[in-house]
């Protein structure tokens, strides 16, 4: 699950529900402490979890999530919408390089906007180690937006914020 605060200061709780079969977006109250009662179900029976959300400067929303395979890594899933409540369009796996079918052996956890750089985002993910959970790690990768239509994640052994200047 994740929380997302839109540029109008409205907050949303995005989570997997119905035995992990369906994602929900629920608007929170003005003080962010309870659900407002306004919500939307999407991708019923698709079994997504670990949703993350971002909004581009053009106003388009993107979600990256994971399939429900327990400790086993799987291909990420992405979707876009012009409104937070949809309709949402499935875009497929945003990962484009080696180990893309395992989301680089990780699962989405958050998308961090880079302050001071327009439409620059960092994809943050958990890398689980079921045999020794204390050894779990995190990966951070630059997230590219292609023509405001697709998001793309490419594995980088090393990178810094200058990657967003290209």
Q: Which residues does each predicted region cover?
A:
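Carbohydrate-active catalytic/glycan-binding domains of CAZyme proteins
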Residues: 1-166
């Amino acid at each position: 699950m994740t929380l997302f605060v839109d540029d109008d200061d409205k907050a949303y709780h995005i989570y997997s529900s119905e035995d992990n079969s369906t994602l929900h977006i629920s608007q929170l109250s003005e003080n962010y402490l309870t659900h407002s009662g306004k919500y939307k179900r999407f991708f019923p029976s698709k079994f997504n979890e670990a949703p993350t959300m971002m909004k581009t400067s053009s106003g388009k929303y993107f979600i990256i999530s994971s399939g429900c395979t327990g400790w086993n890594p799987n291909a990420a899933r992405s979707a876009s919408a012009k409104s937070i409540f949809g309709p949402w369009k499935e875009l497929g796996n945003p990962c484009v390089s080696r180990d893309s079918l395992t989301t680089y052996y990780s699962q989405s956890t958050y998308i961090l906007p880079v302050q001071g750089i327009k439409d620059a985002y960092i994809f943050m993910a958990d890398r689980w180690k079921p045999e020794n959970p204390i050894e779990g790690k995190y990966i951070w990768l630059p997230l590219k937006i292609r023509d405001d239509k697709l998001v793309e994640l490419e594995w980088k052994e090393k990178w810094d914020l200058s990657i967003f200047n290209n």
